[in-house]
Regions:
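Membrane-helix boundary/coupling elements in multi-pass transport proteins
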Residues: 88-101, 165-208, 252, 261, ...
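Transmembrane helix-loop junctions in multi-pass membrane proteins
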Residues: 15-21, 206, 230-251, 274-277, ...
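Membrane-interface loop-to-helix entry segments
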Residues: 2-57, 112-116, 258-263, 284-298
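Helix-loop-helix junctions that connect adjacent transmembrane segments
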Residues: 29-172
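Inter-helical loop and helix-membrane interface segments of multi-pass membrane transporters/permeases
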Residues: 1-7, 13, 52-77, 243-247, ...
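Hydrophobic membrane-spanning alpha-helices of multi-pass integral membrane proteins
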Residues: 223-235, 262-265, 289-310, 337-342
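TM-loop-TM module centered on a large, flexible mid-protein loop between adjacent transmembrane helices
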Residues: 111-187, 206-255
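Terminal cytosolic tails of multi-pass membrane transporters
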Residues: 267-291, 309-378
């Protein structure tokens, strides 16, 4: 299983390495499989709920399920937002590859908005259908059954589609959808981060080797391979930890915290960058100032709240607990993962600042700096 996971990342890295067109076409296939199968699953489940053939314990769909004021406490709300930020991560890939789109001034923004809408509708439909079909009971196929938590779609898929040959065929397609989703997630982790390190290298924030472009595929070679290699290293580290599955779950929470941090920072940066335009029109004030800044504040507040919850074992919604050496404090696993990641990031920051001081002295990137495009390697 470990070897399969490593080979999986290698294959996804190679696809990203081969070019943006190959990656985009592969992503279309994966996304198409996901959306079609989730739609078929959801509609079939809702039809069975409607005609009374769903398993005992099914529920009638209710619009009240979307009411945030029905959430039991604010901590659960904050944790849910951070989790959704993690789920959304990767759907903004078009923004990271904007220079490689046909219309870099409009297409990435439209794609980001469209992808957000598609993700929202898809998740709402699947959640409504699965909660209606399975109910929240703690036995059988109920969503409250902890034994179903690791493979909800597979368990519900067998019941939704039935045991007929065609139903079995759809169930296997659903499992293929899960596999394609894993592939798409891996690809949308490597692809945008490679472009981020490419941009950082072009402006000399990190070593210039990360700015190398393949002469034929026109992809960032070192950046792509490095991101794939880091993914493998993290995967191996998680696998060989004392509580592998639990640590992976905590890593998801910790990554969500960092995504909330840098999404929030992006909102602040947007408001600051366009600060001179804010008084020119009401639209600019809202779209370039108030909304990005408010979004940044909300994400930082919820992220900070979640960090505090993850620090205290009594309130942490984590998968593991860790005891701090010498002082014997018990803290949540997500907090530990977040702190370790922060220490690694701080060390990398000082290393790059010492090796590449020009960027940190604002000599390579200012407001007036033109967009730099690296030449492909010959």
């Amino acid at each position: 299983m470990l070897l399969v996971g490593v080979l999986w990342i290698v294959v996804m890295t190679y696809i990203c390495y081969r070019g943006i067109e190959v990656s985009a076409n592969f992503q279309k296939i994966l996304l198409g499989i996901e959306l079609v199968m989730l739609l078929v699953l959801s509609v079939t489940a809702l039809v069975k709920v409607g005609n009374g053939t769903a398993p005992p314990g099914h529920l009638t769909p209710s619009i009240s399920w979307l009411n945030p004021f029905h959430i039991s406490n604010f901590s659960a709300f904050a944790s849910g937002i951070i989790l959704m930020v993690f789920i959304y991560w990767g759907w903004d890939t078009a923004v990271s590859v904007n220079e490689e789109t046909k219309d870099k001034n409009k297409t990435p923004g439209r794609a980001a908005i469209l992808s957000t809408f598609i993700l929202l509708v898809t998740y709402a439909l699947v959640i409504f259908s699965m909660q209606s079909f399975a109910g929240i009971k703690t036995t059988g196929n109920g969503l409250g059954n902890i034994h179903n938590a690791g493979d909800v779609l597979s368990i519900q898929g067998h019941l939704v589609f039935g045991t007929t040959p065609f139903g079995s065929f759809l169930t296997h397609l659903l499992l293929l959808m899960v596999l394609s989703s894993a592939a798409a997630s891996t690809q949308t982790t490597i692809l945008p981060t490679a472009r981020t390190t490419l941009s950082m290298a072009v402006y000399k924030a990190i070593p210039s080797a990360f700015a190398k472009i393949h002469h034929r595929y026109l992809t960032p070679t070192v950046s792509t391979i490095a991101m794939g290699g880091i993914s493998i290293a993290v995967y191996l580290l998680m696998h060989y930890s004392s509580n592998g599955i639990g640590v992976i779950g905590d890593a998801v929470i910790a990554i969500g915290l960092y995504i909330a941090f840098y999404y929030g920072l992006t909102g602040f940066a947007c408001a600051w960058y366009y600060r001179r335009n804010l008084t020119s029109s009401a639209r600019n004030l809202w779209m370039q100032g108030i909304i990005p800044f408010a979004g940044g504040l909300i994400l930082w507040f919820l992220g900070g709240w979640s960090v505090w919850l993850d620090y205290d074992v009594a309130t942490a919604n984590d998968y593991t607990m860790w005891t701090v050496p010498w002082i014997h404090w018990q803290v949540g696993g997500a907090f530990v993962v977040a702190v370790i990641a922060a220490l690694v990031g701080i060390a990398a920051y000082f290393y790059c600042k010492i090796r590449n001081p020009a960027f940190f002295k604002k000599q390579t990137l200012t407001r007036s700096t033109e967009t730099l495009v690296p030449d492909p390697d010959t």
